[in-house]
Curated annotation (Swiss-Prot):
Name recorded for this polypeptide: Small ribosomal subunit protein uS14c
A GO CC term assigned to this protein in UniProt: chloroplast
Compartments, as annotated in UniProt: Plastid, Chloroplast
Subunit structure as annotated in this protein's UniProt entry: Part of the 30S ribosomal subunit.
Length: 100
């Protein structure tokens, strides 16, 4: 189980990302379309003034049950340990244990 503070930090990052994504996208689009060097610097400084945790690449996928950041399966939203437990207890429809 991950620390509660880490899980809350991720929730805060997701909230900040949702809040600042439109503003960040408009600034980035203006930055790409501008050819003047000075105006590019101005736009770049505005982008840098946005909160660091509002960037999308700061968000880490975490298991919804345990908060584990590694061994994460996107299709199910859980870590490998939880996926195995849920598959064995038939909580995931259509998932079967492979045998060959």
């Amino acid at each position: 189980m991950a620390k509660k503070s880490m899980i809350e930090r991720e929730k805060k990052r997701i909230k900040l990302n949702n809040k600042y994504t439109p503003k960040r996208n408009t600034l980035l689009q203006a930055y790409r379309q501008t050819e003047d060097f000075q105006s590019r610097l101005d736009i770049h400084s505005k982008i840098q003034k946005l909160p660091r945790n509002s960037a999308k690449n700061r968000i880490r996928n975490r298991c919804w049950k345990t908060g584990r950041p590694r061994g994460f399966y996107r299709d199910f939203g859980v870590s490998r340990h939880v996926l195995r437990e849920m598959a064995h207890s038939c909580l995931l429809p259509g998932v079967t244990k492979s045998s060959w």
